[in-house]
């Protein structure tokens, strides 16, 4: 049973998404709180499932497939909802677009490389990017309540969330470049073999 826990956590993260969307649209404090808690649970299971899989020696093909999909679904859903409700607005939308575009590009690149039996390992910088994304989205989801709790002069939860969103977008560009360079190098080396 313990060996199945990482995959159960990953699948659970996907199952959380519709409930997260419903909670996001619940009015008031309890809606904000419920959406935030569900996002935190999803973010924590992202860390936990990989760690458990490595600890238990249960890294599986299913986990390799579903983990990045689950990550992208929760992040993309949260960013789209935050843009739709105006929390992320104006030029800040560019940061969300950068993040979403990178996720699509890198997913395609991973798929392309997988055909050649080449794995694209997650870099430490990409892990940092993910942590910053999760924290920024969590702060942005915290709404007015978060602003009351986190408020240092001109920096409240929303402002800090936007700053971290831009930082994660910058890391997103850097890691996308790194992954694309590796992918292009591989594609060119394959072309040279022909």
Task: Please name every model-derived segment.
Residues 2-3, 11-15, 64-67:
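Hydrophobic alpha-helical transmembrane segments of integral membrane proteins
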Residues 104-112:
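Membrane-water interface of transmembrane alpha-helices
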């Amino acid at each position: 049973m313990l060996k199945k826990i990482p995959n159960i956590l990953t699948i659970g993260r996907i199952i959380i998404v519709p409930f997260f969307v419903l909670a996001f649209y619940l009015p008031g404090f309890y809606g904000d709180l419920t959406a935030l808690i569900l996002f935190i649970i999803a973010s924590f299971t992202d860390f936990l499932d990989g760690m458990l899989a490595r600890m238990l020696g249960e890294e599986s093909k299913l986990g390799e497939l579903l983990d990045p999909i689950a990550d992208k679904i929760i992040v993309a859903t949260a960013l789209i909802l935050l843009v739709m409700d105006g929390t992320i607005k104006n030029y800040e939308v560019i940061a969300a677009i950068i993040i979403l575009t990178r996720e699509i590009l890198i997913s395609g690149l991973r798929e392309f490389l997988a055909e050649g039996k080449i794995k694209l390992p997650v870099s430490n910088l990409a892990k940092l990017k993910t942590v910053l994304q999760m924290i920024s989205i969590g702060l942005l989801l915290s709404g007015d309540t978060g602003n009351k709790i986190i408020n240092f002069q001109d920096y409240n939860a929303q402002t800090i969330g936007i700053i971290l969103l831009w930082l994660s977008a910058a890391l997103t560009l850097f890691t996308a470049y790194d992954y694309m360079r590796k992918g292009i190098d591989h594609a060119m080396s394959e072309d040279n073999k022909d």
